[in-house]
């Protein structure tokens, strides 16, 4: 499984995303640009320039016509995927740490940082119809996270619920229509930050990764933890694979401690676990810093990882992966 290595950023990666068809890969980093690549050969298609701070997050709509991004310059921006033109800009008092389109691409959520006396929020907007659509600047609702600072968020199937992961290890559920708080649950160890939240393709359950070295699969309707994946290192990212019942986890020793460690001791591998049996199946090496973000190809043919080292590594699963059968 030889990867394609994409070198298009000068700073650590923050998030990578495939589009709905899987033919494009978008990468965000702390160097103020978003790159888009052909996922099958690693050719760079273009760059989205305009942000003036580290870019934390991006998302693409189903038709791959619009891309939304959030950054440390306290803005969320909407882009034309094809031309790279900035179509719309929303301004906030603090940095935008996570953005996501809902399932029918009519709304966007933005998670903002708790900073300088401002409370952390999850703000939901309508997707603008045109560049001159001034009404889209007004939020549909604003959730002020009462539990602790929200770090990640996402929409469930049919935009029924909105889930948030928090700095204290809890996960909260909100009514996605009204923004009303439904319930909160301490899923991870208290005081351990939830670093990622990704849904299974049908959005009926999702996986969280956490600094407490575990990842947990949670059912949308029952709000119960259905699976727990134990590792020996703080996790930054986790994702399900749509073909084969696996989860891929990424993390490693904290970036600030990395200079004192060999790559093997830093535990910078991507880890594959059996999604149902919770057993580790294997690891993929390559990055020489913590893995910050993992995205799985929508058709399950491969995955990409972005690291603190500034590289994106695109992997394609070989025949052995698809033939693999776990024996008890």
Swiss-Prot record:
InterPro entries, per the entry: eIF3i, WD40/YVTN_repeat-like_dom_sf, WD40_repeat_CS, WD40_repeat_dom_sf, WD40_rpt
Localization: Cytoplasm; Nucleus
Record keywords, A-Z: Cytoplasm, Initiation factor, Nucleus, Protein biosynthesis, Repeat, WD repeat
A GO MF label: translation initiation factor activity
Described function: Component of the eukaryotic translation initiation factor 3 (eIF-3) complex, which is involved in protein synthesis of a specialized repertoire of mRNAs and, together with other initiation factors, stimulates binding of mRNA and methionyl-tRNAi to the 40S ribosome. The eIF-3 complex specifically targets and initiates translation of a subset of mRNAs involved in cell proliferation.
Subunit structure: Component of the eukaryotic translation initiation factor 3 (eIF-3) complex. The eIF-3 complex appears to include tif32/eif3a, SPAC25G10.08/eif3b, tif33/eif3c, SPBC4C3.07/eif3f, tif35/eif3g and sum1/eif3i. This set of common subunits may also associate exclusively with either moe1/eif3d and int6/eif3e, or with SPAC821.05/eif3h and SPAC1751.03/eif3m. The eIF-3 complex may also include SPAC3A12.13c/eif3j.
The protein, known as: Eukaryotic translation initiation factor 3 subunit I
Gene that this sequence comes from: sum1
